[in-house]
Amino acid sequence: MAADHTDVLIVGAGPAGLFAGFYVGMRGLSFRFVDPLPEPGGQLTALYPEKYIYDVAGFPKVYAKDLVKGLVEQVAPFNPVYSLGERAETLEREGDLFKVTTSQGNAYTAKAVIIAAGVGAFEPRRIGAPGEREFEGRGVYYAVKSKAEFQGKRVLIVGGGDSAVDWALNLLDTARRITLIHRRPQFRAHEASVKELMKAHEEGRLEVLTPYELRRVEGDERVRWAVVFHNQTQEELALEVDAVLILAGYITKLGPLANWGLALEKNKIKVDTTMATSIPGVYACGDIVTYPGKLPLIVLGFGEAAIAANHAAAYANPALKVNPGHSSEKAAPGT
């Protein structure tokens, strides 16, 4: 076979994709990752590498970047091929092979395909406040790539979900001052996190303002002020800030995958209990999939990845059984 051929092609190198690759490798098959981001890890790397994750089995807490590091090390003995900075554009059937072409004009073939593309293409949701776009990169942020960026700064966080609440807590030991505003009286974040947030507020370690919204951002070469307002009384407050962290969610798009002929439901790929899509030989796992009872959790993505990988392996090589047996009974990976 040509050098661009592997037994299995995995679209997406986020946590679910990486773990799927591990299991494909455990079954003795070759595999390639195709991902538009410049490095593995998906959103964990691109959006919150220094955010703690608390719901991964066996880890009381783990930095997102450390979880990715472990996944990359886990799959490394199986010699994965990484095609990073390439978006999968088309999927075609050529005889008993699939051909995927990418945004870089490359074509890769495989006997089976696993789609682990996360939420698809994503970009931050802007709230449209005057000065917001003007100061992007000069004090307005939509993600925390490094906590060090906020060292000793007065930070305004805008949002009411898990990211906003988690970062308000996570930056307590870094920022000089934290103010969190949310346009509703109640937060959407996990109950335990909200309880911890309000405790920190009561102790004077950070400020919480509800129901407040961002009216405008002001400054010179960098952000200097943020004007917020109470959305019921319209009362304004001018806050001296060094950084405005807008965590209002992300706009996601399925992108080219929408044209692959897959059965979809609300921009998610429909799968059965084997993680099979509507196209035989194409499987999917992680945040990209939907099925009755689906929850968008990393820990579930790992389970889905194992199911998808083992069924894809058996499809690519019918001599293999779907059940891989126990990993503890096998030789160490790479030996």
UniProtKB/Swiss-Prot annotation:
Binds 1 FAD per subunit. One of its GO terms (molecular function) is NADP binding. It is an enzyme of class 1 (oxidoreductase). Transmembrane segments: none annotated. Coiled coil: none annotated. Its cofactor is FAD. FAD binds at residues 35, 43, 48, 88, 122, 287, 328. The keyword NADP applies. Keywords: FAD, Flavoprotein, NADP, Oxidoreductase. It catalyses: 2 reduced [2Fe-2S]-[ferredoxin] + NADP(+) + H(+) = 2 oxidized [2Fe-2S]-[ferredoxin] + NADPH. It comes from the Bacteria. Its EC number is 1.18.1.2. Homodimer. Belongs to the ferredoxin--NADP reductase type 2 family. This is Ferredoxin--NADP reductase. It comes from Thermus thermophilus (strain ATCC BAA-163 / DSM 7039 / HB27).
